[in-house]
Swiss-Prot record:
GO terms for cellular component: plasma membrane. It is found in: Cell inner membrane. NCBIfam families: PRK06076.1-2, PRK06076.1-6. Belongs to the complex I subunit 1 family. NDH-1 shuttles electrons from NADH, via FMN and iron-sulfur (Fe-S) centers, to quinones in the respiratory chain. The immediate electron acceptor for the enzyme in this species is believed to be ubiquinone. Couples the redox reaction to proton translocation (for every two electrons transferred, four hydrogen ions are translocated across the cytoplasmic membrane), and thus conserves the redox energy in a proton gradient. This subunit may bind ubiquinone. One of its GO terms (biological process) is aerobic respiration. It comes from Ruegeria pomeroyi (strain ATCC 700808 / DSM 15171 / DSS-3) (Silicibacter pomeroyi). It is a multi-pass membrane protein. Keywords: Cell inner membrane, Cell membrane, Membrane, NAD, Quinone, Translocase, Transmembrane, Transmembrane helix, Ubiquinone. NDH-1 is composed of 14 different subunits. Subunits NuoA, H, J, K, L, M, N constitute the membrane sector of the complex. GO terms for molecular function: NADH dehydrogenase activity; oxidoreductase activity, acting on NAD(P)H, quinone or similar compound as acceptor; quinone binding. This is NADH-quinone oxidoreductase subunit H. It catalyses: a quinone + NADH + 5 H(+)(in) = a quinol + NAD(+) + 4 H(+)(out).
């Protein structure tokens, strides 16, 4: 039996099992993310939230998913049918394949490539095409305006996210997530992670992640009061479910990136306690809680304010920070906090 797993067929079976494990984790997490998002929003508004289907309403997301699946897919008469159907599939698939390089523990990763950050950045940049396709194929002004807003917004904040990540790459000397996490394993626990030397960038990265994933207060592409529901106006049933799932998976991915880049990934915050996947999952859950709280308590930005914030505040500040980190790493300032090449690599 052991010899079988050394054959091409056995290796392919192992890879398939690993892929299915990651997909299962993301999809099960998705159900609880939607439930948690609704519960947190309800708690802030002093409501109960989902509480009927299952114990404490835990199966509400399953019921909603089944409802969307069994509904009829309605395609507008003037829509481009092929692109209309491909758009949500594109959005969902691109959100899923980004997880191929995300490690949950030391060695627990589908593809441990040296350019993992570049891969995630490339895939996340392509996600805007799903939104644009959906808005254009609907043949309606509201979806089209929403998709144009989304394109401008995602491109604007991708620049800042890229520059912030470059600062982390300069400190580590690697684009591999495993190397970045190991570079934060200094023996100081919570205070040895990158959030401390890169403290200003943590806030910029988090706010840019909100804009990148179209989350409140930056949900301009689907602003109900302005565009009805943006690029999702004409969608229903399974295509709408795929759009929504892709959006939440992208949010969860940003939570994972925040954990890996600045908060030690699977490392324990307390020296002496064992590291492991539970720390990684706990950190991702905590950052999603922050995402949900921001959605519940912040008013929506105006579109011109959103663009001004991205281009006139975040971009210059992140550019200056990259230059600062480059000098700090080169000349070993701040006791080597910005130059951990030997640790990470």
């Amino acid at each position: 039996m052991a010899e079988f797993f050394d054959t091409p067929g056995g290796i392919a079976l192992i890879i398939l099992a690993q892929v299915l494990a990651v997909v299962a984790f993301v999809m099960i997490s998705l159900l609880f993310l939607v439930y948690g998002d609704r519960k947190i929003w309800a708690a802030v508004q002093m409501r109960r939230g989902p509480n009927v289907v299952g114990v404490y309403g835990l199966l509400q997301s399953v019921a909603d998913a089944l409802k969307y699946v069994v509904k009829e897919v309605v395609i507008p008469a003037g829509a481009d049918r092929t692109v209309f159907i491909l758009a949500p599939m594109t959005s969902f698939v691109l959100a899923m394949i980004a997880w191929a390089v995300i490690p949950f523990n030391d060695g627990w990763v589908l593809s441990d490539i040296n350019v993992a950050i570049l891969y995630v950045f490339a895939v996340s940049s392509l996600e805007v095409y799903g939104v644009i396709m959906g808005g254009w194929a609907s043949n309606s002004k509201y979806p089209f305006l929403g998709s144009l807003r989304s394109a401008a917004q995602m491109i604007s904040y991708e620049v800042s996210i890229g520059l912030i990540i470059i600062g982390v790459i300069l400190s580590t000397g690697s684009m591999n997530f495993g190397d970045i996490v190991r570079a934060q394993d200094t023996g100081w626990g919570f205070f040895g992670w990158y959030w401390l030397p890169h403290f200003p960038m943590v806030f910029l990265f988090f706010i840019s992640a909100l804009a990148e994933t179209n989350r409140p207060p930056f949900d301009l592409p689907e602003a109900e009061s302005e565009l009805v529901a943006g690029y999702q106006v004409e969608y229903s049933a399974t295509p709408f479910l795929l759009f929504m799932a892709g959006e939440y998976i992208a949010i969860f991915l940003m939570c994972a990136l925040t954990s890996l880049l600045f908060f030690g990934g699977w490392l324990s915050p307390i020296p002496g306690l064992p590291d492991g996947v539970l720390w990684m999952v706990a950190k991702m859950a905590f950052f999603f809680f922050i995402f949900a709280m921001v959605k519940a308590i912040t008013p929506r930005y105006r579109y011109d304010q959103l663009m001004r914030l991205g281009w006139k505040v975040f971009l210059p500040f992140s550019l200056v920070w990259v230059v600062f980190v480059a000098f700090a790493a080169k000349f070993d300032w701040f006791w080597g906090a910005f130059a951990r090449w030997s640790v990470g690599g």
